[in-house]
Amino acid sequence: MRTLVYQRRIHLAASPERVFEFHLDPANLRLLSPSWASVTRLVLPPRFGVGSRLEIGVRLLGLIPQRWCVEITRLDPPRELVDEAISGPFPFWRHTHTVTPGEGGGAELVDRVEYRPPGGMLGIWMDRWTTRLMLGLMFRHRHARTRTLLESPETGGA
């Protein structure tokens, strides 16, 4: 089955090191979660490292329960963090967070998700109206929250 890719980038007025450190703190995961994907269970390590696992329970739109177990499979500070689903709703899921210096200062954050949607060929055919739509909504929210949290004067940002 074909692997699909979703990618979104954002420029942040924060150093690449600060952006990377923010993503290394598991507590920030709850801060980035949209309200329509309410976190019902979160078992986190104190800090992410290769081999770290986290368990996440979410309820999409308040109705659809999902359980995930995700493992950090690559860590290249301050540039790259990769997590892969060990179990969850997707047959395959790899999320790569890449942080690089931004043009003119700051940092560029790229979230790249490689995935195989559930439902086989029907899942691939429906991807535009299901998984891709949800990923777009989720990462727009996550990037907006990341910007707020890293750039606001109250949180020590720009």
Regions inferred by a protein language model and the residue ranges of each:
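Glycine-rich portal/gate segments that line the openings of hydrophobic small-molecule binding cavities
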Residues: 41-87, 108, 141-158
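Beta-strand/loop substructures that line and gate deep hydrophobic ligand-binding cavities in soluble
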Residues: 84-137
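Hydrophobic ligand-binding cavity/cleft-lining segments
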Residues: 1-50
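Intrinsic-disorder/low-complexity, polar/charged segments enriched in Ser/Thr/Lys/Arg/Asp/Glu/Gln
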Residues: 3-9, 53, 67, 80, ...
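Short alpha-helical segments used as structural interaction elements across diverse proteins
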Residues: 5, 56, 125, 129, ...
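Short strand-connecting beta-turns/loops that link adjacent beta-strands
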Residues: 15, 77-78, 102-106
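Hydrophobic/aromatic beta-strand elements that line small-molecule binding cavities or substrate pockets
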Residues: 8-10, 41, 67-74, 85-86, ...
